[in-house]
Amino acid sequence: MSGSDRGDRLYDVLGVTRDATVQEIKTAYRKLALKHHPDKYVDQDSKEVNEIKFKEITAAYEILSDPEKKSHYDLYGDDNGAASSGGANGFGDEDFMNFFNNFFNNGSHDGNNFPGEYDAYEEGNSTSSKDIDIDISLTLKDLYMGKKLKFDLKRQVICIKCHGSGWKPKRKIHVTHDVECESCAGKGSKERLKRFGPGLVASQWVVCEKCNGKGKYTKRPKNPKNFCPDCAGLGLLSKKEIITVNVAPGHHFNDVITVKGMADEEIDKTTCGDLKFHLTEKQENLEQKQIFLKNFDDGAGEDLYTSITISLSEALTGFEKFLTKTFDDRLLTLSVKPGRVVRPGDTIKIANEGWPILDNPHGRCGDLYVFVHIEFPPDNWFNEKSELLAIKTNLPSSSSCASHATVNTEDDSNLTNNETISNFRIIHTDDLPEGIRPFKPEAQDSAHQKARSSYCCIQ
């Protein structure tokens, strides 16, 4: 089974092709997430259906937007991390060819070793010390506003006096304390068996961890008389460092900020690893997260979402509603002037009131989407028929409805078998049987579109 046959489901969920760019995947996710966000739906059944769809879309985006996860998915076609079935035993022809491409090419390291040893040897023979991971606990406001943090750290550095050997320097003469590595017998690499599928095992050469691939290492002094006076025979010293971490506005939780070359130094390593600061979440963010209906983890985008409920009269005549308190302590109030009609299904888009765009030189933000729920009155809400008449008189009539009322009345004037339907059930458009589309007269659609073009609502 080819990779394209077994690994297209997540691409289909987002409606993109396998060769889609990161931006195309992000754009597709934002459109679908806005369309299927469960808070847009009042009906409980519709809410539950779209909640499932929303979670499926988000899960697909989390994998396809991550290069490492996407690569794994493209290869194995399984978003749960395990290889999907291919061939008779879960190991297909493509996997078999990849195995031989990885382990039986490029010759060997010195002409006498296992084929493919050179690649494995080079990959394992790292010249850099290990990275250090540090968690930073932040609030949503910290991420929105940005924050500068200082850390007092102690890091290990190689002793200058003994150059990391741990031995007391000898005057006038140079003494070496290198010995052959017994772990790899001086070869610098060791043979290891690696499993690539059911019944498929190969021998692979990897760098020796004890000597770091050199075949030898420096023997540490045991007698305190031979200890370096500065590092007491350890070869390393502890050094205090003040590290400044700038959390720029617009970061998300799970983002990683890297400070290059400031990890611990290690003996026999030519370069230092990095400090990696992982942005984690403080628990007091729950209320704000519920207000903005957003996943604030990494890759979540810059748009924010919230919702309001208005009455039918407010939808027709305008309204002024408090929205929320922003992360920079502003109070946002939405004002829709009389004359602008908000229709069922409309979503109000407020530009530049979303999440900050990371490293944007102009300080731009994403957008704030406001899902509008229109609360209709219950049946038989009126007290007098005169109230209904007043509404009919003041509201504009539909020309399309009038045209339907007069169609073919002259030809049908002699018919006596007329019937008025009063027993019916009103259902939501989302609950229509599959394949049935709601009818929209062209004149009504045109008028609707013209009215909507004058203000910033999207559907």
Swiss-Prot record:
<dbReference type="Pfam" id="PF00226">
    <property type="entry name" value="DnaJ"/>
</dbReference>
<protein>
    <recommendedName>
        <fullName>DnaJ protein homolog XDJ1</fullName>
    </recommendedName>
</protein>
<dbReference type="GO" id="GO:0051087">
    <property type="term" value="F:protein-folding chaperone binding"/>
</dbReference>
<dbReference type="Pfam" id="PF00684">
    <property type="entry name" value="DnaJ_CXXCXGXG"/>
</dbReference>
<dbReference type="GO" id="GO:0005739">
    <property type="term" value="C:mitochondrion"/>
</dbReference>
<dbReference type="GO" id="GO:0005741">
    <property type="term" value="C:mitochondrial outer membrane"/>
</dbReference>
<keyword id="KW-0862">Zinc</keyword>
<dbReference type="GO" id="GO:0005634">
    <property type="term" value="C:nucleus"/>
</dbReference>
<dbReference type="Pfam" id="PF01556">
    <property type="entry name" value="DnaJ_C"/>
</dbReference>
<dbReference type="GO" id="GO:0030544">
    <property type="term" value="F:Hsp70 protein binding"/>
</dbReference>
<dbReference type="GO" id="GO:0030150">
    <property type="term" value="P:protein import into mitochondrial matrix"/>
</dbReference>
<dbReference type="InterPro" id="IPR002939">
    <property type="entry name" value="DnaJ_C"/>
</dbReference>
<keyword id="KW-0143">Chaperone</keyword>
<keyword id="KW-0472">Membrane</keyword>
<keyword id="KW-1000">Mitochondrion outer membrane</keyword>
<dbReference type="GO" id="GO:0008270">
    <property type="term" value="F:zinc ion binding"/>
</dbReference>
<keyword id="KW-0863">Zinc-finger</keyword>
<dbReference type="InterPro" id="IPR036869">
    <property type="entry name" value="J_dom_sf"/>
</dbReference>
<feature type="zinc finger region" description="CR-type">
    <location>
        <begin position="146"/>
        <end position="240"/>
    </location>
</feature>
<feature type="repeat" description="CXXCXGXG motif">
    <location>
        <begin position="159"/>
        <end position="166"/>
    </location>
</feature>
<keyword id="KW-0496">Mitochondrion</keyword>
<keyword id="KW-0479">Metal-binding</keyword>
<dbReference type="GO" id="GO:0042026">
    <property type="term" value="P:protein refolding"/>
</dbReference>
<dbReference type="InterPro" id="IPR044713">
    <property type="entry name" value="DNJA1/2-like"/>
</dbReference>
<dbReference type="GO" id="GO:0001671">
    <property type="term" value="F:ATPase activator activity"/>
</dbReference>
<dbReference type="InterPro" id="IPR036410">
    <property type="entry name" value="HSP_DnaJ_Cys-rich_dom_sf"/>
</dbReference>
<dbReference type="InterPro" id="IPR001305">
    <property type="entry name" value="HSP_DnaJ_Cys-rich_dom"/>
</dbReference>
<dbReference type="GO" id="GO:0051082">
    <property type="term" value="F:unfolded protein binding"/>
</dbReference>
<feature type="repeat" description="CXXCXGXG motif">
    <location>
        <begin position="228"/>
        <end position="235"/>
    </location>
</feature>
<dbReference type="GO" id="GO:0006457">
    <property type="term" value="P:protein folding"/>
</dbReference>
<dbReference type="InterPro" id="IPR008971">
    <property type="entry name" value="HSP40/DnaJ_pept-bd"/>
</dbReference>
<feature type="repeat" description="CXXCXGXG motif">
    <location>
        <begin position="208"/>
        <end position="215"/>
    </location>
</feature>
<keyword id="KW-0677">Repeat</keyword>
<feature type="repeat" description="CXXCXGXG motif">
    <location>
        <begin position="181"/>
        <end position="188"/>
    </location>
</feature>
<dbReference type="InterPro" id="IPR018253">
    <property type="entry name" value="DnaJ_domain_CS"/>
</dbReference>
<feature type="domain" description="J">
    <location>
        <begin position="7"/>
        <end position="79"/>
    </location>
</feature>
<dbReference type="InterPro" id="IPR001623">
    <property type="entry name" value="DnaJ_domain"/>
</dbReference>
<dbReference type="GO" id="GO:0005737">
    <property type="term" value="C:cytoplasm"/>
</dbReference>
